[in-house]
Amino acid sequence: MTYAIVETGGKQYRVQEGDTLRVEKLTAGEGETVVFDKVLAISRDGKVTVGTPYIEGAKVTAKVAAHGKGPKIIVFKYRNKTNYRRKTGHRQPFTAITIESIEG
């Protein structure tokens, strides 16, 4: 079982070939290929290689499946006795990707 730990959008993800996951929004369009070169670790056949902080020459390629927005969260500010109320919503944009290959 081969897996890698990649960094994108300020977060780290454990990925395997064929995985589909949601990452922070990427600029690539749907159907395009994205290459992640910030690979922190790779495990092949039980042997783990850890970078310092990244593994040189390692890369993970993925295909952009879709773009979208996450669930809505409500932000409500309130101050008592002053009739101050502010209600806003936020939906975080994401990109769904499918991992194609792990090299390195």
Swiss-Prot record:
One Gene Ontology MF term: structural constituent of ribosome
The record's listing under InterPro entries reads: bL21-like, bL21-like_sf, Ribosomal_bL21, Ribosomal_bL21_CS
> Superkingdom of the source?
Bacteria
Report the transmembrane regions from the record: none
Question: Which SUPFAM superfamilies is this protein grouped with?
Answer: L21p-like (SSF141091)
Task: Explain the purpose of this protein.
Answer: This protein binds to 23S rRNA in the presence of protein L20.
Similarity remark: Belongs to the bacterial ribosomal protein bL21 family.
Q: Which named protein is this? A: Large ribosomal subunit protein bL21
Question: Which species does this protein come from?
Answer: Symbiobacterium thermophilum (strain DSM 24528 / JCM 14929 / IAM 14863 / T)
